[in-house]
Amino acid sequence: MLTLPSSPDFRLDNQRALVTGGSRGIGFAAAVALARAGAQVWIAARNAGQLSEAAGLAAQDGLRLQTLELDITDTAQVRQRLGALPDFNILVNSAGLARHQPFLEVSEENYDAVMALNLRATFFLSQQVARRMKAGGIAGSIIHISSQMGHVGGPERSVYCASKFALEGLTKTMALELGEAGIRVNTLCPTFIATELSRASLSDPEFSRYVLDNIKLRRLGTLEDVMGPVVFLASPAAALITGAALLVDGGWTAT
């Protein structure tokens, strides 16, 4: 017999969310989107001034973003400061670093810096949050902000690509191990998004042309393009999605 299905639920009321790298760019946009969907949101970053600015801007829209000054590469600090907070239902790992050089010129310093933030810090912060989700019986959602560069190569992006490919592998393993606890783990993989971080690279006409030639929709991504997918992956509407990569790349990886 035909029955009418219920509509998917995109609301996040009574959910607690932590967004790393939440004072700028994609992280800030993700935090705003989650707050607008009803979540109680903490934004984490190292710079107290930037955190205050982000929270103040959100407040002008009637949103409350709680701030957490945190260096996520410091695992002892992560344990201490997260220990003083309630358990989270949602984690968005948006903190990241890119240092672009030709492969033959990459220094150990730049390699270590990118891997320390993009992979190691994300790994151990996620471990802390997931342990508490499992212990508290929370069927949570962990979203790693990865990149299209976790699926393709890119010139002068050997270390960045390596960190994001590794993050994709980590996501699948986390999904396998945490699924029985009801914890979902996915990546959101944007193309080039118009932010402060990307402005310098995209100001090069040759590089900008390369980017737009590869984005099939022939435009850069915007922060708004990322906000909906973040809410979707965090929400009950994505209840059966785990171990997946949601590509928000304008078709870059389609070929």
Predicted regions and their residues:
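Conserved glycine-rich cofactor-binding loop
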Residues: 16, 23-25
